[in-house]
Amino acid sequence: MAKELTLSIIKPDAVAKSVIGEIYTRFEKAGLDIVAAKMTQLSREQAENFYDIHRARPFFKDLVDFMISGPVMIQVLKGENAVAKNREIMGATNPKEAAPGTIRADFADSIDANAVHGSDSLENAAREIAFFFEPHELCNR
């Protein structure tokens, strides 16, 4: 089976808790290789453009405000069924509904400050990866 790529963002709440290393360990234990990574402070424009699909939703402004509230860690993960595997280890969007042992169950504070973002499809993964990374920034592993 071909290996997939997916985008993951460790959000400002989790970066502030200094759990990047613990989250990376979970990716690697799940068989997901980190093939690109960067820490950055998103601008309002970047956050608005990245989450443009949610622009008409009532939570859009709060989401953007949260995503620019501190640095984020952005990575590209590669592995068998990477999109589904990453979403499984992230857990449900609402940490109160997330299975024990998932990233959100262990590190998220609320449905808004929910520690991580992960692509929800191969199509969105390709779009999201291209938003943050140039092709030459992805390493072969």
UniProtKB/Swiss-Prot annotation:
PROSITE patterns xrefs: NDPK (PS00469), NDPK_LIKE (PS51374)
The UniProt entry, under InterPro entries, shows: NDK-like_dom (IPR034907), NDK-like_dom_sf (IPR036850), Nucleoside_diP_kinase (IPR001564), Nucleoside_diP_kinase_AS (IPR023005)
Q: What is its EC number?
A: 2.7.4.6
Gene Ontology molecular-function annotations: ATP binding; metal ion binding; nucleoside diphosphate kinase activity
Q: Which GO terms describe its biological process?
A: CTP biosynthetic process; GTP biosynthetic process; UTP biosynthetic process
Subcellular location(s) of the protein: Cytoplasm
Sorted alphabetically, the Gene Ontology cellular component annotations on this record are: cytoplasm
Q: What CDD domains does the entry give?
A: NDPk_I
TM annotation in the entry? none
User: Is the Phosphoprotein keyword given for this protein?
Assistant: yes
Provide the alphabetized UniProt keywords: ATP-binding, Cytoplasm, Kinase, Magnesium, Metal-binding, Nucleotide metabolism, Nucleotide-binding, Phosphoprotein, Transferase
Q: How does it assemble?
A: Homotetramer.
What's the protein name?
Answer: Nucleoside diphosphate kinase
